[in-house]
Amino acid sequence: MAGASIEATLELWASSLRNVKARLRPLFRQERVAASAWKFLDGLLGNEPRKTGWMRAEAAGDPGPWRQQAILGRGWWDAEALRDIVGDYALETLADEEAVLVIDETGFLKQGKASCGVARQYTGSAGKITNCQIGVFASYVSRHGHAFIDRALYLPQAWTDDPERMTAAHVPDDVSFATKPQIARRMIARTIAAKVPFSFVAADSVYGTGELETALRKAGKGYVLGVAANHVFHSWGKKQMVRGSAATIARNIPKSAWRRLSAGDGTKGARLHDWAYLELADLDAGEYNSTLTGKWTRGLLIRRNIADGDLAFFSTWCPQNTPMKKLVSVEGHRWAIEDSFETAKNELGLDHNETRSWHGWHRHVSLVMLAFAMMAVIRHRANITSSPKKTTLRLRITHRS
């Protein structure tokens, strides 16, 4: 087929929606509750700009928002099971051995103090300290597309140290304080335990060093992890000895060592920066896991903004002789999760959750993840049938199940 026709695209949408609704059904004991969940999903995928309970209810033909609200609050179903359904569904289409698992967070701006996990804290979504919730996410990024496969609500210690507040927000008894890097390690461990294929992890400096690095080395996974300018690196077993903070090392890099490379294509074309890469040590993989063999290289990757010279630093771990261009590409995969947050908020109502409970947050976010995964699957399947001359399909279709 030279290109996906409108009719074929509409049928792909309809069949995909039937597929994901069928996967949802086992989560619910009663058909009527499942039907409400299906309508909730319809509302997320619809054209209404605000995905509030009233808006979703109006689109579903319900007399009021209580059925939509019950799905997130009063109903009995397992959001963790839905998370696993989302991952399985997305990976059926997106799985690739060279995929990158990207860890990042996003903020959910809030008013008041009752919403689970809300606090005055920094969020890049607002670019400042403000009243918000923070969600940590794992996105699976491959040549076939990208989708969220895990999520968790971050609870500040002011919350976990307040039993009454935790009870009021219906936080499970076994949930205790965890740093964002600890949340990330749990997500990565779940992904590895599920035998999800991927070769690298990418994350910013919130998650970048210490126990996460060790865990990934033991798992035989490469990484490109952001670090602060004052993070100390040193080399051993190399001809060129290096020791000092990342910023100090960068000042001593000769001009000839910098290369202008693209970290991938963005909305305005190639995302070009200047890059430098220092190999610091070659180590036996067996030092971390007796079942692994071969040499792996620990390194420092530096990115320099072409316009203003601003520097960013990354700790790297990769098979020996991995080219710098590969590490730059891995770091560039982080753009996909930023794009995912924007799309999920603007089109699917990721940040339109009106509930205040722990379960409500995870249920709402998991349903949005399912909607996003469905769009990723449709986009991939539609575009592989499209002519190279055609514009990449952007799916926002009024649907009927």
What are these regions (language model features)?
Residues 1-32, 44, 155, 170-176, ...:
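A short, flexible helix-boundary coil/loop motif
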Residues 2-202, 206-225, 229-232, 239, ...:
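Conserved, well-structured functional cores that handle cations and Mg-NTP chemistry
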Residues 35-38, 54, 132, 312, ...:
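Non-catalytic, well-ordered alpha-helical scaffold segments
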Residues 40, 308-335:
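Extended, non-catalytic structural segments that build the interaction scaffolds
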Residues 64, 306-311, 318-323, 344-353:
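Short acidic (Asp/Glu) and glycine-rich catalytic loops that position anionic groups and cofactors
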Residues 217-218, 331-332, 387:
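Short, solvent-exposed amphipathic alpha-helical segments in soluble enzyme
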Residues 326, 337-343, 380-382:
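Extended hydrophobic-aromatic, low-complexity segments
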Residues 335-342, 368, 372:
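Feature representing long, continuous alpha-helical segments
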